[in-house]
UniProtKB/Swiss-Prot annotation:
Family: Belongs to the TRAFAC class translation factor GTPase superfamily. Classic translation factor GTPase family. EF-Tu/EF-1A subfamily.
GO molecular function terms attached to this record: GTP binding; GTPase activity; translation elongation factor activity
Region of interest (G4), ranges: 149-152
CDD domains: EF1_alpha, EF1_alpha_II, EF1_alpha_III
Annotated stretches, region: G1: 14-21
Organism: Methanocaldococcus jannaschii (strain ATCC 43067 / DSM 2661 / JAL-1 / JCM 10045 / NBRC 100440)
UniProt-recorded name of the protein: Elongation factor 1-alpha
Gene3D superfamilies: P-loop containing nucleotide triphosphate hydrolases, Translation factors
Cleavable signal peptide: none
Binding-site list for Mg(2+): 21
List of residues binding GTP: 14-21, 91-95, 149-152
Residue span of region G5: 189-191
Location of region: G3: 91-94
Location in the cell: Cytoplasm
Length: 428
């Protein structure tokens, strides 16, 4: 079997109208990741509807429609291969969904591609673009590439490209602590295919990489195998003749059969008999592996979704209270002391109370602008103290980043996002 390419999770971010989904579609289409049979079917339909010459946008619309109708399209649709990587695209259609996904780590991205419309040079950087980039920074995404898109609408002008590049560099990237000299700015026209996978003949002045080549310049993620074991539990099954089988994704550390494990905040422990991935037994599980593991000495009723598995010598931290840095994404009024929304951290969902508002920060620079603010509103960044209403595991983001991030939800929407920067552990 050929050695598998390393997986790279790439988030596509930017304003909704910058052509993100077209860029993603073009990447998938030109790198042959869309199922050929589906393409044939769509081509035929395009011809029947008099759209001969096979409109790319038509394919994208149909993929979108198929998604909306709930028809599962070949999963290849969200993955494609470059020379170096198997790339998984974390493309988030809805702005708020995107933010929640990015923060809860469900789709912890290794790198991001910021897609902007070259025409924004005239109007200024879109607020949503700023917010996405700030979040990418807050979440520790260090590697980014920029696609300056819709170049076809400015006649592939180098001057317009340079204007946009300068504006992004000075007003956004440098402010957030990125070094523009280490970032590829690729002039693209996704609808036409320029510089996404295929090199454009319309911009001979551009000598840099295509978007796909820029992805290959990213560094692969280090697997956090040296950190303590943490497996947030997604489900627990009781299988006849086998016993209790918790299921989850290994976030950090290594799990092997024979290991003694402890589940928190449940406070129960047992011994691992076997580990399965994709219905095959494996000798050890590493970060990124979605596994089921059979545990002796634990019953199904002892543990549940939201518990975290670790080794007894370094068990998951159950928080009495914690200090967090948050960004308020949307709140109809204001957040004050006593507010108790639901925190989504790894697989846990626990109501937590704001017990102190310590500092208000400038969301663009992180500088303190007010000590002990009375309230927080949409757009504010802050440092706050939080008390869970019932036991939950959360880790200091500086020690185990994979379990240090969370989203805050209330009234059916994501109110805020953040990370734990100090955790006071519960005394046993």
């Amino acid at each position: 079997m050929a050695k598998q390419k390393p997986v790279l999770n790439v988030a596509f971010i930017g304003h909704v109208d910058a052509g993100k989904s077209t860029t993603v579609g073009r990447l998938l289409y030109d790198s042959g990741a869309i199922d050929p049979q589906l393409l044939e079917k769509l081509k035929r339909e395009a011809q029947e509807r008099g759209k001969a010459g096979f409109e790319f946008a038509y394919v994208m619309d149909n993929l979108k429609e198929e998604r909306e109708r709930g028809v599962t399209i070949d999963v290849a649709h969200k993955k494609f291969e470059t020379q170096k990587y198997e790339v998984t695209i974390v493309d988030c259609p809805g702005h708020r969904d995107f933010i929640k996904n990015m923060i809860t780590g469900a789709s912890q991205a290794d790198a991001a591609v910021l897609v902007v419309d070259v025409n924004d040079a005239k109007t200024g950087i879109q607020p949503q673009t700023r917010e996405h980039m700030f979040l990418a920074r807050t979440l520790g995404i260090k590697q980014i590439a920029v696609a300056i898109n819709k170049m076809d609408t400015v006649n592939y002008s180098q001057e317009e490209y340079e204007k946009m590049k300068k504006m992004l560099s000075e007003q956004l990237l440098k402010v957030l602590g990125y070094n523009p000299d280490q970032i590829d700015f690729i002039p693209t026209a996704s609808l036409k295919g320029d510089n996404v996978v295929k090199r454009s003949e319309n911009m001979p002045w551009y000598k840099g990489p295509t978007l796909v080549e820029a992805l290959d310049k990213f560094q692969p993620p280090e697997k956090p195998t040296n950190l303590p074991l943490r497996i947030p539990i997604q489900d627990v099954y009781s299988i006849t003749g086998v016993g209790t089988v918790p299921v989850g994704r290994v976030e950090t550390g290594i799990l092997r059969p024979g290991d003694k494990v402890v589940f928190e905040p449940a406070g129960v422990s047992g011994e691992v008999k076997s580990i399965e991935m994709h219905h095959e037994q494996i000798p050890q599980a590493e970060p990124g592996d979605n596994i089921g593991f059979n545990v002796r000495g634990v019953s199904k009723k002892d543990i549940k979704r939201g518990d975290v598995c670790g080794h007894p010598d370094n068990p998951p931290t159950v928080a009495e209270e914690f200090t967090a840095q948050i960004v308020v994404l949307q709140h109809p009024t204001a957040i004050t002391v006593g507010y108790t929304p639901v925190f989504h951290a790894h697989t846990a969902q626990v109501a937590c109370t704001f017990i102190e508002l310590l500092k208000k920060l400038d969301p663009r620079t992180g500088q303190v602008i007010e000590e002990n603010p009375q309230f927080l509103k949409t757009g504010d960044a802050a440092i706050v103290k939080i008390k869970p209403t019932k036991p939950m595991v959360i880790e200091n983001v500086r020690e185990i980043p994979q379990l240090g991030r969370f989203a805050i939800r209330d009234m059916g929407m994501t109110i805020a996002a953040g990370m734990a920067i100090d955790v006071k552990a519960k005394n046993k």
